[in-house]
C-alpha cells in the first residue's frame, strides 16, 4: 500500500525555513547516511513527490543545475508561476490535495509518496486524512522565527512514535 510521508528537518524551535524562506541553515548540517534518517535509503522507496511553490523556487534558485529528483513532482501553488527551465517531469496544481494525491499514487508505480515541504502543505494532506507518516530530523539550531514545521493544529495524530 502506498503511503504519504512528510520527511523533513526542523530546528529545535520548530522551523523548517528561516524568515526569508531560506534553507541555508539546513544545508550546513551533516547528513548521517548510516543513521535512522538515511536519505539515500528513504528516496529509493519514493515514486512521486509534492512540494509547495516556495520550496520549489528555493530549490531552483539555490541548487542550480540538474533537478535533484528523478521521480514525477507536483508543485502546489496558488499563484501563476513562470519558471523558465522548469524540469520536465514537474506538474503544477492548486486547490484540493485529494486529486493530486490520486495522481501521485498512480504515477508512483507502487512506491511511496513524499511531501518535500512545506508545513502548510503537509497540514493540508493531514487535514484530508492522507498523511500517513511524519519523519523529522531535529537539527541543533534555533532560528527564532520562520516557517513552522506544521503551522496548524492536527488532531488526533495517528502516527506512532518510532524513535527519538
Locate the predicted segments by residue.
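Enzymes that bind and transform nitrogen-containing heteroaromatic metabolites
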Residues: 1-164
Amino acid at each position: 500500500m502506498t503511503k504519504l510521508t512528510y520527511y523533513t528537518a526542523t530546528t529545535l524551535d520548530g522551523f523548517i525555513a528561516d524568515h526569508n524562506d531560506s534553507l541555508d541553515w539546513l544545508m550546513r548540517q551533516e547528513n548521517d547516511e548510516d543513521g535512522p534518517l538515511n536519505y539515500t535509503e528513504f528516496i529509493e522507496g519514493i515514486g512521486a513527490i509534492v512540494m509547495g511553490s516556495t520550496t520549489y523556487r528555493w530549490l531552483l534558485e539555490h541548487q542550480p543545475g540538474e533537478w535533484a529528483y528523478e521521480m514525477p513532482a507536483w508543485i502546489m501553488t496558488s499563484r501563476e508561476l513562470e519558471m523558465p527551465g522548469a524540469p520536465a517531469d514537474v506538474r503544477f496544481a492548486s486547490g484540493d490535495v485529494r486529486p493530486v494525491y490520486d495522481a501521485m499514487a498512480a504515477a508512483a508505480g507502487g512506491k511511496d509518496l513524499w511531501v518535500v515541504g512545506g508545513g502548510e502543505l503537509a497540514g493540508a494532506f493531514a487535514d484530508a486524512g492522507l498523511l500517513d507518516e511524519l519523519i523529522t530530523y531535529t537539527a541543533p539550531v534555533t532560528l527564532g522565527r520562520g516557517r513552522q514545521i506544521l503551522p496548524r493544529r492536527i488532531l488526533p495524530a495517528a502516527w506512532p512514535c518510532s524513535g527519538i
